[in-house]
């Protein structure tokens, strides 16, 4: 008993030493693999080594299945090299035993006899099929996937790096997160490149296995007849069984490792970082219609005479019953009331952005288009938009609804036959246009022929899921100011502080964060980009000691951003067509400005607001592309008058134009003395 305890203690100590010196263990394994090529091994040791080879290949296959991200096993290319070397060394050892002793151990003999099964021809055919499947189907396919993945990863690396740099400059991510993302991109590129090269090891190992089997059979038959005086039939049977067993001992672990490599290379990890089985079941379960239709097809096959009814009916029921039970459970819940949300979903606060639509409009293309649109708006405005939560209605409908913080702000019916959409002032050129609410412009639903006609005029036409993302873009631009508040401003300031710490500290000394947030909100509500936060913060620091009114601070920031504003409004640099506001209207607005503790507003009568708006609309009918220009102190109040119905019409101040801008005064508007006198009365 004491001897057994002593052996157990020594074994534990030995394992502890090995666990602390993994480098020595790996080096020893590689040296053993090389020694196996040179020295003959006893059959019992060969059985142990074959078992280790099979065990390790099964471990790798299971690890590949349970991986949530291929980069979690970034050493896999090196493992492929090590396992290939080990397997080739083992093949050489077994081949030596087959040719010298016509006995390569129990496992080789058992594999050969099991596959041959008393019929040598069947055994050769089975072995050939296994080898062809591995070489032509699995190995060739994985090699191609690895090659394409490595190439695309390398080609897309600069774009990913630029995207990370853009997010960092905009304050969407901090420096530590950006460093982590860059390392991930580099590691992914190196991993896929290494996998591309490592698959050559697997391909070469398969070819070597085929050659070794042929050499063993031919060489074994010659040795058996010449040296051991065996008959031809006995030699063929003996060495064929041993050669097939030897080949299978190498090909089956190689097949498992090739399958592991294929799972890892073809894996596209999801956002939730789940293993392969979980993602597979969840994604298939999202398409219950396909399972139901498959069950129907199996049942129809079962009804054909001669087909096995019980087998086909069993699998048909196996597919259909879970879907039916789940739907019945949902219908019971909806009939009895709303199902209680999970505990983790009970988060305070309203959801920022919800898109509610018909199931016929929802698709994977829509998700991609919405993500692309969000990134475009971020690049254009500098506002990091929240994720769009898509709510699919249970029944098909033509209605599309957008909700901001659980409140509907936009609703529209999409005609069933309208496969194309035209947005903008030119929408009425092709067909009957429809005016969107809140000054978001005009749209026109088009048929296919009308869409071709619009494209002939050089107009941008949206089709499919792009129709939805384009409408959502209009809504987001109209309500962009609602996505900038104190919390978002603090986030942007924290991101800027990493590179401009003194600038942010001085800004916080000069202005409270609520005024900074209001300034940014007023800028983005008029589609002024806040990407250049350094210039915006610097301007606020310059003017904050002298000006406390947020309206005027915003105007000074706009003047500082005039190059950005003019470049967006007039990218071609042509003379700006100007609609000039007369002095009478400016003085009228200026005299009506009231400052209170609640803020600054105008006390204009509703009649004069209507008159000013009508004058602007009449001028725009004469020339649709006009830029309204007025004094800096009245610009914001005129914008307040027009934004409800003319949201897309920009209003600038003379100071924003500057002396270097080329302008062309197309129209001037003003109120007559009688109309101004009416206001005084």
From Swiss-Prot:
<keyword id="KW-0812">Transmembrane</keyword>
<feature type="transmembrane region" description="Helical">
    <location>
        <begin position="73"/>
        <end position="93"/>
    </location>
</feature>
<dbReference type="InterPro" id="IPR042194">
    <property type="entry name" value="FHIPEP_1"/>
</dbReference>
<dbReference type="InterPro" id="IPR042196">
    <property type="entry name" value="FHIPEP_4"/>
</dbReference>
<keyword id="KW-0472">Membrane</keyword>
<feature type="transmembrane region" description="Helical">
    <location>
        <begin position="244"/>
        <end position="264"/>
    </location>
</feature>
<dbReference type="InterPro" id="IPR025505">
    <property type="entry name" value="FHIPEP_CS"/>
</dbReference>
<comment type="similarity">
    <text>Belongs to the FHIPEP (flagella/HR/invasion proteins export pore) family.</text>
</comment>
<dbReference type="Pfam" id="PF00771">
    <property type="entry name" value="FHIPEP"/>
</dbReference>
<comment type="function">
    <text>Component of Salmonella pathogenicity island 2 (SPI-2) type III secretion system, required for secretion of some type III-secreted effectors including the SpvB toxin.</text>
</comment>
<keyword id="KW-1133">Transmembrane helix</keyword>
<feature type="transmembrane region" description="Helical">
    <location>
        <begin position="48"/>
        <end position="68"/>
    </location>
</feature>
<dbReference type="GO" id="GO:0005886">
    <property type="term" value="C:plasma membrane"/>
</dbReference>
<dbReference type="InterPro" id="IPR006302">
    <property type="entry name" value="T3SS_HrcV"/>
</dbReference>
<feature type="transmembrane region" description="Helical">
    <location>
        <begin position="295"/>
        <end position="315"/>
    </location>
</feature>
<keyword id="KW-1003">Cell membrane</keyword>
<dbReference type="InterPro" id="IPR042193">
    <property type="entry name" value="FHIPEP_3"/>
</dbReference>
<feature type="transmembrane region" description="Helical">
    <location>
        <begin position="409"/>
        <end position="429"/>
    </location>
</feature>
<keyword id="KW-0997">Cell inner membrane</keyword>
<dbReference type="InterPro" id="IPR001712">
    <property type="entry name" value="T3SS_FHIPEP"/>
</dbReference>
<feature type="transmembrane region" description="Helical">
    <location>
        <begin position="118"/>
        <end position="138"/>
    </location>
</feature>
<dbReference type="GO" id="GO:0009306">
    <property type="term" value="P:protein secretion"/>
</dbReference>
<keyword id="KW-0653">Protein transport</keyword>
<feature type="transmembrane region" description="Helical">
    <location>
        <begin position="25"/>
        <end position="45"/>
    </location>
</feature>
<protein>
    <recommendedName>
        <fullName>Secretion system apparatus protein SsaV</fullName>
    </recommendedName>
</protein>
<feature type="transmembrane region" description="Helical">
    <location>
        <begin position="206"/>
        <end position="226"/>
    </location>
</feature>
<keyword id="KW-0813">Transport</keyword>
